């Protein structure tokens, strides 16, 4: 490559912190304050036990131009139920989640689906399962490629189906028959090309034949899909992108089974989920389209996304109501794993100390494998973890309540709370000045004015090892 060609490929951009930031005082929104504190807790879990003054000092140090008082920090944490022993009732939506019997599901030999009043629909062991045993493996019911790679896909630099970055040249792809003969997109393998063959043309090719846009029986408007795809990329809205692909696959399934299976999953409206966000000021994953705005702005975003969504499916406008759109988005958000939807895996309920390990393949189209993390008894429920078990119990509870609508009461959560209480109770409170004076006076009365003379140790020449105190030590100087 010549120097001139290289120069054309290089773009000089300005880094955010190279531009001087505003130094004037800024009054942050209450959600900004609470989200900042939650971020501090995530970065350093030990800060969760700090008092309000120290926590306020960290916030001020991190955001020096914020005009936020210690009193306001305390008020906001109390308002959103983020202070210890708070009496504030926190919003949950587990009771709003519904599910139905899953039709046409082929389960592994050792497990069965059981519906209970407390846990809802779950997977239970029919027979004893040994630790380390492969219980089942499955490929996605709905595969969702990475939204972030869309521009690379459009230029043939990533696989049109799985989104995998391509190292081969376009020429070699053409020789292998992996290039599309209509658009610039290519596939990484014959397998991906085969999996993508039915839907690729419907989503992306009609735009190249304007006459087809006049066909009344067309179930997918590719031009509208490409517009929606760009919109999702701009807004970082993975859930909207995902449900568009899911509904396209549902329309292509002439048996109607995929639609029934998706509707049978744990189902909740996205606007209900958003209430949990507002009640805690904690953030959803930004890709889910749920954490960027206050309620009024969020409603506007949903409406705009809905209008773009229904334009993609011109023959389904009577069926696709705004209410159903929100249900589809909420259902996707609480059931997806690594952005994809798995039929059997979606039945696994949560436990912070799960008895299964779910291993997703680095090759995303290959799906996942579920192993027994320990011996599982016959009749025992199979569980997975929705959050990182290594996080503090408070952080796990926040994430579970906002993203899945419930407050976990598993044994690990109970034990973690007990451990925290024991640690707090074992800490000796700092002595007050009056207590120190009383201690000194009592010591003087006991030993007299001359004090105690300490003789040097008989063995010298070796430095004593330092003593590490686990309790607080009071040093007194005259």
Curated annotation (Swiss-Prot):
<dbReference type="InterPro" id="IPR001214">
    <property type="entry name" value="SET_dom"/>
</dbReference>
<dbReference type="GO" id="GO:0042799">
    <property type="term" value="F:histone H4K20 methyltransferase activity"/>
</dbReference>
<dbReference type="GO" id="GO:0032259">
    <property type="term" value="P:methylation"/>
</dbReference>
<dbReference type="GO" id="GO:0045814">
    <property type="term" value="P:negative regulation of gene expression, epigenetic"/>
</dbReference>
<dbReference type="GO" id="GO:0005737">
    <property type="term" value="C:cytoplasm"/>
</dbReference>
<dbReference type="GO" id="GO:0005694">
    <property type="term" value="C:chromosome"/>
</dbReference>
<keyword id="KW-0539">Nucleus</keyword>
<keyword id="KW-0949">S-adenosyl-L-methionine</keyword>
<protein>
    <recommendedName>
        <fullName>Histone-lysine N-methyltransferase SET5</fullName>
        <ecNumber>2.1.1.-</ecNumber>
    </recommendedName>
</protein>
<feature type="domain" description="SET">
    <location>
        <begin position="109"/>
        <end position="387"/>
    </location>
</feature>
<keyword id="KW-0808">Transferase</keyword>
<keyword id="KW-0963">Cytoplasm</keyword>
<keyword id="KW-0489">Methyltransferase</keyword>
<comment type="function">
    <text>Histone methyltransferase that monomethylates 'Lys-5', 'Lys-8' and 'Lys-12' of histone H4 (H4K5me1, H4K8me1 and H4K12me1, respectively), thereby controlling gene expression and remodeling chromatin structures.</text>
</comment>
<dbReference type="GO" id="GO:0005634">
    <property type="term" value="C:nucleus"/>
</dbReference>
<comment type="similarity">
    <text>Belongs to the class V-like SAM-binding methyltransferase superfamily. Histone-lysine methyltransferase family. SET5 subfamily.</text>
</comment>
<keyword id="KW-0158">Chromosome</keyword>
<dbReference type="Pfam" id="PF00856">
    <property type="entry name" value="SET"/>
</dbReference>
<dbReference type="InterPro" id="IPR046341">
    <property type="entry name" value="SET_dom_sf"/>
</dbReference>
């Amino acid at each position: 490559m010549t120097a001139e060609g290289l120069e054309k490929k290089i773009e000089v951009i300005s880094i955010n912190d190279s531009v001087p930031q505003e130094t004037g005082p800024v009054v942050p929104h209450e959600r900004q304050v609470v989200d900042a504190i939650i971020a501090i807790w995530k970065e350093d879990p030990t800060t969760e036990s700090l008092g309000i003054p120290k926590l306020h000092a960290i916030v001020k140090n991190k955001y020096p131009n914020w005009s936020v008082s210690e009193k306001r920090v305390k008020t906001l944490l109390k308002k959103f139920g983020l202070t210890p022993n708070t009496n504030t009732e926190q919003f949950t939506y587990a009771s709003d989640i519904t599910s139905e019997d899953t039709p046409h599901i082929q389960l592994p030999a050792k497990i069965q689906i059981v519906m209970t009043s407390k846990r809802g629909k779950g997977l239970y062991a029919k027979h004893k399962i040994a630790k380390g045993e492969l219980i089942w493996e499955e490929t996605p019911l709905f595969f969702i490629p990475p939204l972030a790679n869309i521009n690379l896909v459009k230029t043939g630099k990533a696989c049109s189906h799985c989104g995998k970055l391509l190292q081969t040249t376009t020429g070699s792809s053409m020789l292998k028959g992996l290039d599309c003969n209509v658009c610039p997109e290519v596939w990484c393998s014959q397998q991906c090309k085969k999996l993508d063959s039915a839907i690729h043309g419907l989503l992306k090719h009609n735009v190249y034949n304007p006459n087809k846009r006049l066909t009344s029986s067309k179930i997918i408007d590719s031009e509208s899909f490409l517009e929606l795809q760009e919109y999702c990329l701009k807004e970082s809205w993975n859930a909207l992108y995902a449900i568009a692909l899911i509904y396209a696959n549902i329309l292509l399934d002439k048996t109607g089974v995929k639609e029934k299976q998706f509707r049978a999953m744990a189902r909740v409206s996205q606007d209900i989920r958003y209430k949990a966000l507002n009640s805690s000021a904690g953030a959803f994953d930004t890709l889910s389209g749920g954490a960027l705005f206050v309620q009024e702005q969020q409603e506007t975003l949903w409406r705009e996304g809905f209008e773009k969504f229904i334009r993609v499916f011109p023959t389904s406008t009577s069926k696709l109501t705004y209410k159903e759109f929100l249900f589809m988005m909420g259902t996707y958000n609480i059931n997806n794993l690594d952005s994809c939807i798995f039929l059997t895996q979606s039945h696994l309920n949560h436990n912070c100390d799960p008895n299964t390990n779910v291993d997703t393949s680095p090759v995303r189209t290959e799906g996942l494998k579920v192993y027994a993390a320990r011996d599982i008894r016959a009749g025992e429920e199979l569980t997975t973890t929705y959050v990182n078990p290594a996080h503090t119990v408070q952080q796990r509870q926040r994430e579970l309540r906002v993203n899945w609508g419930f407050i976990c009461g598993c044994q690990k959560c109970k034990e973690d709370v007990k451990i925290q209480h024991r640690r707090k109770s074992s800490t000796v409170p700092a002595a007050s000045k009056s207590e120190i004076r009383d201690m000194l006076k009592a010591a003087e009365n006991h030993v007299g004015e001359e004090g105690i003379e300490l003789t040097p140790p008989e063995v010298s020449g070796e430095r004593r090892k330092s003593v590490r105190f686990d309790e607080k030590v009071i040093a007194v100087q005259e």
